[in-house]
Amino acid sequence: MIFSKIESYEDIVKKLDKKEDKIAIISCNTCARTCGNGGINKLNELGFRLIREGYNVTDEAVVLYACSEPILRESKLNIDDANTIIVLSCSAGWSCFTRNYPDKKVLKVTEDIGLVITDTDREIFKVVMPYKGHESELGNEYRTNSGEPLTSNKIKLRCVA
């Protein structure tokens, strides 16, 4: 599973034009939800805040896997009114949307950190293969669905670089 972190709200709105952008927010319900930057909760949080601040949010949807072109086709998203798509997913999901919606501005609002393993019974995930620039994340654990860092290790696994 890919661990990504979402940009700050302030950084996201810097990429938007309040007058011109008609925004669709699409959220991954797998990796991004598990990491706390996708799923219905993060979609609603971002969507409501943008609307409150006067942005034109035309559509919102949750897809099972944002990185899967067959799943994307099966989703039959109706985002014709949008000219801008905010994708709450890892870079693989963002890339899938850029390929399938070349006529729209597709915003990447997350940064990939690395690969993780999950313990769904204890609702935690652990970074086991950080990407370049994120080596300090090796072995760090987080609460699933929120991305909240944990202070003690729960998953017993030796991580080596």
Where are these regions (language model features)?
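Short gly/ser/thr-rich secondary-structure transition/capping motifs
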Residues: 67-71
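N-terminal glycine-rich "phosphate-gripper" loop used for MgATP/nucleotide binding
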Residues: 87-91
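Iron-sulfur (Fe-S) cluster-binding modules
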Residues: 1-63, 74-85, 96-161
